[in-house]
């Protein structure tokens, strides 16, 4: 029986962050990974066998990863900014095709785009005022994510923005969106950040939690492209972890843990037993042990579609595709469309009109393609469909996934000057290079419970009881057992935050 200071379940990015911090502090660390490869939902894969293109199959953008973690661990890794924040095509009252273009840094074309949509400057001014407040709020709350939990009163005082606290924390996000914005399309673009991976109405408080995490990342809320794809990020974490002596064992699914005040004993699927003073779970608790208390949560409600294109398709509006697809392209995501889709999804149905958003990784970072594919003009396209609950796939995952895929393509084709099918790359068997991953696929492939990309419902980033104040938000009902993955407080997204916080809980215990 081998003995360690710390055993970690799962070699996803959070597990590797925790392992790196602990090993750097001199701890003997073992990471047990159930799959044959490391990375979990942050791996890159050659999704289409005939082409040298390594796609981020599951997670695909990074906003929440603090610069402090990159600096602390000495990660040689780069996140790239996108010139365009978003583009939302629409058909105006004269049946003309147009679109709302929002640059990452506000400019005249963004100003003109808002005016063309709304006929006034008021919506653009409201946008700048609202996101200015949110960015200020983010800059004050972001550093606290790597500190012990404060009470809500302490955090409110620390941030010292009572009005923003009220509409971001206390009241449904839908209220402030409707109050501050008058255009249905603009309202929807704002609302999408509250719904990524979250089955909620605009007036459900889970939407607030999701919105908060999507907008506070690294104090700016900017969503960046990982250079080299998610796999490059994981490879760098692996390099750092192993350089400090971390031992990583793949194909080693944990089947049992015993924990008491003296430490933990872990048994893996190969019937090997390991002991340690501490145990950290990067995996969702239900996939590790029934002994770890679990809170009930919403099921996953998104579909991820990956594509390889011979070139980007032309749009009816005439906008340069390299602008339209560089940021997030919103489809069927007006406020009213999102609410209608939720009403259908919450009773287990696939929405008639699928809200979705997409972006092209290779416009910002072509390095995930071989030089040959780059020279030939190939591009990748990622689509993320909202309000597709796991329950809608249970009767037949394959059939339901096909239906959603068809809806997604149809929704995009409505705004294209040529069908998507004409620009999809084809493999040697004549099949289009497109794949779709439903919530049930995410559960089967990377152990996300019911396809919930956050493992559990996101929680607000402060202590919700007196007992939690001063703790790290990673504690469990078992002694010496901590959560270092997405289901920890302040977990969710590609952040490394719960990995850091679990490591701190060990080092300061």
Label each residue range with its predicted role.
Residues 247-248, 252-268, 427-444:
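Beta-rich nucleic-acid/ligand-interaction surfaces
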Residues 214-263:
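Helical element adjacent to the flavin cofactor pocket in flavoenzyme catalytic cores
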Residues 183, 187-199, 353-359, 418-489:
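A glycine-rich dinucleotide-binding beta-alpha-beta segment and adjacent secondary-structure elements
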Residues 253-373:
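Mid-domain catalytic core of redox enzymes
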Residues 286, 308-310, 373-408:
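Conserved FAD/dinucleotide-binding core of flavoprotein oxidoreductases
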Residues 486-507:
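A conserved FAD-binding loop/helix module that cradles the flavin
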Residues 95-204:
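Rossmann-like flavin
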Residues 2-140:
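N-terminal glycine-rich phosphate/pyrophosphate-binding loop and immediately adjacent elements
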